[in-house]
Amino acid sequence: MENAKLFFEEFIGEKSLDFYSLAQSGSARKNFVGSTPNQQYIITENENIPENESFFYFSEIFSGLNLNTPKIFKISEDRKIYIQEFLGKHTLSEIIEKEGLNERTKSLVRQTLEKLFQLQTSTEGKIDYSKTFEYESYDEFPVTNDLFYFKSFIADVLEIPYHKATLLKEFKHLTSEIENCAPKGLMIRDFQARNIMVNDNDEVFFIDYQSAMKGPLMYDVISFLYQAKANFPEDFREEMLSCYFSLWKDENTVKELKNSAKPIQLIRFMQVLGA
């Protein structure tokens, strides 16, 4: 914490009014809130430089396109600490958990899908996928990796007997289906309500995209609407899917999106079970 605080105070040119850590959530990244009399900031400390570089790369592109993502104000020389925009006190996940599915949360979910559509379409042709963190695209390698998490769950946790060759053939078939899903573009990968901030004006912001890669555009839509913790009712999911499809004006694109929904839904369920 001390290094992050010193870096922040060097940036603001004075002692911080307040400086405290945020709870970690399944990541090695450490986040802090630093305050001046007029403004709050997020200070992030992370030893994983390739992960940081991916975040910096995407943030620069997103800021240039005026998307709903944090601006980065300063990066340390060793690329391990950075100061970013403070975008709200609560995640969308916290709001859903507290309020349930009311008119406010429905509006926030709809806004999230609209902002996702904006990100997907405005970044088309503007991403160098060689700069991604772990995988350039959601192809055979990450798909197979996800499926083998599920295999370990079946074999090691539930101890359900299965025919190995048959299961592997099914994996191969599903991998091929996922690889052929269209349209493709920027896929955030971990597009969950816990990674979406909501400010005092009920505007949503995406904050966790360092693992983004090229992939089927329906992946993030399905990840978001079918996340277990939100527990959206099926009729609301269908309503929001229709809302998302209506944003696309090309009928062939909508047809492709609809055709890719079921295979992606299946692999997302398998990922959740495997994790």
Task: List each model region and its residues.
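Protein kinase-like catalytic core scaffold
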Residues: Y41-I42, N68, Y82, G185, ...
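Active-site acidic catalytic loop and adjacent metal/ATP-binding pocket
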Residues: K30-S35, L119, H173-Y219, N231
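An alpha-helical support segment within catalytic cores of ATP-dependent transferases
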Residues: A4-E10, E124-E136, F141-P142, D146-L186, ...
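Secondary-structure capping and boundary motifs in well-ordered enzyme cores
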Residues: P142, I188, Q210-M213, A261-L266
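Active-site activation/catalytic loop segments of kinase-like enzymes and analogous catalytic loops
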Residues: N145-V157, L217-N252, L266-A275
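Juxta-kinase regulatory segment immediately upstream of eukaryotic protein kinase catalytic domains
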Residues: M1-Y20
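ATP-binding glycine-rich phosphate-binding loop
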Residues: L17-F32
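ATP-binding pocket architecture of kinase catalytic cores
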Residues: F32-T144, D156
